[in-house]
């Protein structure tokens, strides 16, 4: 199951990178934005499914800290 999780994470990364290409309008792809969003959702679902099968859970405290750091980065850019 760990190999499956790694594979699904890789597919999610690829889907996210394709969406980034669409947003930046660089390195054209025949995939539409709607298709890219659907693909991200599908791959994310696969990652969550694998994580569930492995009984992985979210660390809420870590998520809160990360949320604060990301928010600070956004505020600092503006």
Give the label of every model feature segment.
Residues 1-78:
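Flexible "arm" and connector segments at domain edges
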């Amino acid at each position: 199951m760990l190999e499956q999780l790694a594979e699904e994470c890789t597919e999610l990364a690829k889907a996210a990178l394709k969406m980034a290409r669409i947003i930046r309008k660089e390195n054209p792809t025949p995939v539409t934005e709607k298709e890219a969003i659907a693909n991200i959702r599908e791959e994310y679902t696969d990652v969550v499914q694998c994580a569930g099968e492995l009984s992985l859970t979210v660390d809420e405290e870590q998520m809160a800290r990360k949320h604060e750091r990301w928010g600070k980065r956004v505020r600092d850019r503006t």
